[in-house]
């Protein structure tokens, strides 16, 4: 109790700094303890991740109870001058708000999961592994807490370094190729994104006379002095949008910029896959919400139909490729491509309900995908294969592993009552709403086709996931072929041999160890919690989501009206004019659903 009172007396800004500093300190401690052996290193990493999670969770609770949460304002802001004087007003700033709060907490949660799933899987060079894992945690927390462009970019770039080495050193047979491909793709995109952000900074300085990297100041500045979106201005806003798109689309990844992801997932160690799927893919969507949509609304509106379509393509493409996979981990990797397509589609529907669903689905996918990747790693540790054809009957040998895998599978396919259903439902509802009443008649059919394809993706997702579950867990029991000739810590199939044979009982059971249950149980709790009380998780970001997307949504609606005004008039259109009114899209009446017991959560549905 005294400890909690002490944390409550700590200023929120100090509390935030403590959360981010803890994994950095823990990385140093793990390095120092390296001489004491594997047990000391992994225990120190687990304690560090647990302390970070506790502090992050407490900070999230403090935010939810703060007046800033209700007002949609920044919380726990810590700022220090870096370059102040003359025309420069550059301050390094950290803070949390509705856009970042859940992703911040998710980063801390999945970092503990990543440490625990690596408990017996990593035996070669454990000091370097756990140091890099903790550095990656600090970088992920920093990305979502950064309130200025410089810190955001530093943390954004720094996430690449630990993951590059985690894949390249502790990965599987093609680990080096996967690491290099991952690094080149993401580094190229992030450099272009930084050039785009720097252009925004310079544009703002040319109008205000002050060079600032503060994100809130840049958002206000671009609202007062928008970047030109016309030929006279060189289409500067669209050029900057494309530069940011290059960095964020690769990070998501949006098809066709996804080719690095399946290879990186398959070759990464389990802990790396947990962080990659659970958190790092979300940074791209966060970047769109934090920078592209509020600072470049006209370009966002112009690109929205194309990105809505790319989201639909990603849904179907990822699902179809997942259907033909024979490697369980690769199947889940392509399912991530499909699920991120839903998030992209919901975000660029520019409809309140869809955007709220997309934001919630960031958390949902982080939980379910991280859980599935963690469990696939546990399966490999026991059976030394990920081949679906060589697995079967696991339910009789590892019933708790089966229960958790089925729970995360049902979450992934959107079973009602679980978290995945809520996010997908809101995305689909908002997408159909946009397609039916929110676009010009010329675009209505393409939008409806894309929305219907998203529904087809739900069916395909259930197909490939349930197909895999049936064969791996309930098919005939098969003994996977044992491979001889392990070299350089990898077996003949290229799978890491850093793991162990899980002890089996006299009946052949090889169920989860305590640390494996501890790794996935918190994720399962949140899967159920969000599914049963979604309003609890929809309320905190609602105000910030409206603020972040308002300008882009307004610009998109204006573009739709302009497109309809320029459409050729037909006799049928004259009839429609009498019913609808002057050739414009149907006037949109709105009604609000207020979720109880959280009246702050409003889902606004429009109707003709």
Stretches found by the model and what they are:
Residues 268, 396-400, 465-580, 591-593, ...:
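Cytoplasmic/organellar membrane-interface segments at the starts of transmembrane helices
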Residues 36-38, 128-135, 139-227, 231-232, ...:
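Alpha-helical multi-pass transmembrane bundles of energy-transducing inner-membrane proteins
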Residues 36-52, 121-135, 150-153, 171-192, ...:
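Membrane-interfacial loop-to-helix junctions in multi-pass inner-membrane proteins
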Residues 64-91, 192-258, 288-306, 354, ...:
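Juxtamembrane/interfacial segments at transmembrane-helix boundaries in multi-pass membrane proteins
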Residues 27-32, 57, 112-116, 138-142, ...:
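Alpha-helical transmembrane segments of multipass membrane proteins
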Residues 2-15, 29-131, 210-226, 572, ...:
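Transmembrane helix-loop-helix hairpins at membrane boundaries of multipass inner-membrane proteins
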Residues 17-33, 47-59, 106-118, 136-138, ...:
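Central hydrophobic cores of alpha-helical transmembrane segments in multi-pass inner-membrane proteins
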Residues 11-22, 96-107, 149-162, 237-248, ...:
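Structural signature of hydrophobic alpha-helical transmembrane segments
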């Amino acid at each position: 109790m005294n400890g909690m009172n002490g944390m409550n007396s700590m200023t929120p800004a100090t509390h935030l700094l403590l959360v981010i500093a803890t994994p950095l300190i823990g990385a140093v401690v793990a390095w120092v303890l390296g001489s004491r052996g594997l047990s000391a290193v992994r225990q120190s990493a687990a304690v560090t991740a647990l302390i970070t999670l506790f502090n992050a969770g407490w900070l999230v609770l403090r935010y939810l109870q703060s007046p800033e949460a209700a007002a949609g304002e920044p919380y726990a802001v810590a700022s220090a001058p870096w370059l102040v004087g003359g025309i420069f007003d550059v301050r390094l700033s950290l803070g949390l708000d509705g856009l970042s709060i859940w992703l911040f907490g998710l980063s801390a949660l999945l970092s503990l999961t990543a440490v625990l799933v690596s408990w017996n899987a990593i035996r070669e060079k454990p000091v370097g592994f756990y140091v890099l894992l903790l550095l990656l945690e600090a970088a992920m927390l920093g990305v979502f807490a950064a309130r200025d462009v410089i810190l955001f970019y530093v943390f954004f770039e720094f996430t690449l370094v630990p993951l590059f080495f985690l894949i390249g050193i502790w990965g599987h047979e093609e680990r080096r190729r996967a690491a290099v491909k991952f690094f080149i793709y993401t580094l190229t995109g992030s450099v272009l994104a930084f050039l785009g952000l720097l252009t925004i900074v310079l544009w703002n300085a040319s109008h205000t006379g002050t060079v600032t990297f503060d994100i809130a100041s840049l958002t206000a500045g671009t609202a007062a002095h928008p970047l030109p979106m016309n030929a006279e201005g060189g289409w500067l806003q669209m050029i900057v949008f494309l530069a940011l798109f290059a960095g964020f689309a690769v990070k998501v990844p949006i098809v066709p910029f996804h080719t690095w992801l399946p290879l990186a997932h398959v070759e990464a160690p389990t802990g790396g896959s947990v962080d990659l799927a659970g958190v790092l893919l979300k940074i791209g969507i966060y970047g769109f919400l934090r920078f592209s949509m509020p600072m470049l609304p006209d370009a966002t509106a112009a690109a929205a139909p194309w990105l809505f379509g790319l989201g639909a393509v990603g849904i179907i493409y990822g699902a179809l490729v997942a259907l033909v996979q024979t490697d369980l981990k690769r199947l889940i990797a392509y399912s991530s491509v499909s699920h991120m397509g839903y998030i992209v589609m919901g975000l660029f529907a520019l409809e309140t309900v869809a955007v709220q669903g997309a934001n919630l689905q960031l958390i949902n996918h982080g939980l379910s995908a991280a859980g599935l990747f963690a469990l696939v790693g546990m399966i490999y540790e026991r059976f030394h294969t990920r081949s679906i054809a060589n697995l079967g009957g696991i339910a009789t040998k590892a019933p708790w592993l089966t229960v958790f895998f089925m729970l995360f599978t049902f979450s992934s396919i959107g079973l009602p009552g679980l978290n995945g259903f809520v996010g997908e439902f809101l995305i689909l509802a908002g997408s159909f709403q946009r397609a039916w009443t929110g676009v010009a008649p010329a675009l209505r059919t393409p939008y409806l086709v894309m929305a219907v394809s998203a529904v087809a993706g739900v069916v395909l997702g259930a197909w490939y996931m349930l197909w895999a579950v049936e064969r791996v867990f309930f098919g005939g029991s098969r003994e996977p072929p044992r491979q001889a000739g392990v070299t350089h810590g990898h077996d003949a199939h290229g799978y890491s041999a850093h793991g162990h044979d899980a002890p089996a009982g006299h009946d052949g059971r090889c169920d989860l160890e305590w640390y494996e249950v501890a790794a996935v149980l918190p994720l399962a709790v949140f899967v159920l919690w969000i599914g049963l009380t979604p309003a609890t998780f929809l309320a905190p970001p609602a105000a910030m989501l409206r603020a972040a997307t308002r300008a882009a949504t307004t610009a998109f609606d204006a573009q739709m009206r302009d497109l309809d005004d320029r459409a050729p008039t037909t006799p049928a259109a004259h009839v429609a004019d009498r019913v609808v009114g002057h050739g414009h899209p149907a006037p949109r009446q709105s009604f609000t659903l207020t979720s109880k017991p959280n009246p702050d959560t409003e889902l606004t549905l429009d109707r003709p």
